[in-house]
Amino acid sequence: MLTIELNEDGDVVEIHGDTHGLASLRDIIERLLESPEQIDHAHLMTPAWGGNELSEDVQRESNSLVHHVKLHFWGGA
């Protein structure tokens, strides 16, 4: 499970994950780091948005679910 939410005020991003979900996020980040010449970004989406990387199960009732996250790799140190 990997769920990304915005708090009630919309100024804090919360990442909720179990072992599998956080390991999947780590793997996506590692792919970006290992192949920057081939991959400079990655999409994480809920099933409602055509993906399977993010869960649609809100973990805090007052939060808003994020359906699409785009990770960008800009290289460098």
Task: List the model feature ranges, each with a label.
Residues 1-77:
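Positively charged, low-complexity terminal tracts
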